[in-house]
């Protein structure tokens, strides 16, 4: 039976952070809502531990798994992690979010190991702006996207976080790029997670005006019911999804996600770190699968109807 919280929301998606390490320094990164580790106390789950938790989640009828970070591809054993998850019967949608800088190197072996698709974070198509925002090389990301498309990590999704006064004039360019590469564009509104208040106030902008223009051009508008009711605009040559942050009432109302932090804690809410459920310690102390299942159920019981701030 599908896991449901006390408010009737099914839990269908598992996001597994495999590391908090990253090879970029993006000023806007929210790290999946995870707090930075105490210096010298970095804990990461092993490939076997990650696979075991995914297997238990699948037994609870969670079918969609996404690997996140940090940057998943900085883990030297990332292909092993992907391979172990890829062998689990019952995983329907298996994807990864990456900054793309190492994707050209890993795309083929990840696909062969069982990864189905990737989301690539790409806030801009301008080399100088990309370098300023992330400290990285845009060429590496573009090469990674091209390689992901070539090997069949389909569909490739492009995550464009829209920042006021920085890249909000590039949306049309990014739509054209998505059309040219055969990718799906996701426009993402800045969220106030792990960010200084002044940064959020300075760079946040609503996406409502983009949605008005997208609706005018769309051949069809689709609503993804189990993905925060986000809207998908089918344009003549591209597909664009619009992702609003936590202030959007649909965000919590239709949340179907459970997260696992890189140090092995179940995270019921993206915005909170005061209701985590530790599963790594019990696993390392010999807990059975049934006992870990009960910890999953406890995490789901801790889900609230909405984030209260």
Language-model segments: residues:
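Generic start-of-chain signal for non-secretory N-termini
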Residues: 1-4
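Residue-level signature of catalytic and energy-coupling elements of molecular machines
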Residues: 18, 185, 264
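A short, compositionally biased micro-patch
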Residues: 19-21, 113, 261
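A short acidic, helix-capping loop that chelates divalent metal ions and anchors anionic groups
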Residues: 35-40, 126-132, 194-198, 278
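Canonical Radical SAM [4Fe-4S] cluster-binding loop centered on the CxxxCxxC motif
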Residues: 6-47, 269-270
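Accessory C-terminal segments flanking Radical SAM cores
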Residues: 193-308
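Radical SAM/AdoMet-radical enzyme domain recognition
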Residues: 47-67, 71-188
């Amino acid at each position: 039976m599908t896991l449901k919280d006390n408010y009737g929301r099914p839990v269908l998606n598992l996001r597994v952070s495999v590391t908090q390490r990253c090879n970029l320094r993006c000023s806007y990164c929210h790290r999946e809502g995870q707090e930075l580790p105490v210096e010298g106390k970095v804990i990461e789950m092993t490939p076997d531990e990650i696979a075991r938790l995914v297997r238990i989640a699948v037994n609870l009828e969670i079918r969609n798994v996404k690997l996140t970070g940090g940057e998943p591809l900085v883990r030297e054993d990332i292909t092993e992690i992907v391979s172990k998850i890829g062998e689990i019967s019952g995983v329907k949608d298996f994807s990864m979010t990456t900054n793309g800088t190492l994707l050209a190197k890993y795309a083929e072996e990840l696909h062969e190991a069982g990864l189905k698709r990737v989301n690539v974070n790409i806030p801009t198509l301008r080399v100088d702006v990309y370098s300023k925002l992330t400290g990285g090389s845009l060429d590496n990301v573009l090469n990674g996207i091209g390689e992901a498309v070539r090997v069949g990590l389909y569909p490739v999704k492009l995550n464009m976080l829209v920042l006021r006064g920085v890249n909000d004039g590039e949306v049309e360019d990014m739509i054209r790029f998505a059309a040219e590469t055969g990718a799906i564009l996701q426009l993402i509104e800045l969220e106030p997670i792990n960010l200084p208040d002044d940064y959020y106030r300075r760079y946040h902008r609503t996406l409502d005006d983009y949605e008005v223009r997208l609706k005018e051009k769309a051949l069809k508008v689709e609503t993804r019911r189990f993905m925060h009711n986000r809207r998908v605009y089918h344009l003549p040559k591209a597909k664009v999804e619009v992702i609003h942050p936590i202030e959007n009432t649909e965000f919590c109302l239709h949340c179907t996600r459970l997260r696992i932090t890189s140090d092995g804690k179940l995270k019921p809410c993206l915005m909170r770190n005061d209701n985590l459920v530790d599963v790594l310690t019990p696993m390392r102390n010999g807990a059975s699968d049934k006992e870990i299942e009960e910890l999953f159920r406890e995490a789901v019981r801790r889900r609230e109807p909405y984030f209260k701030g």
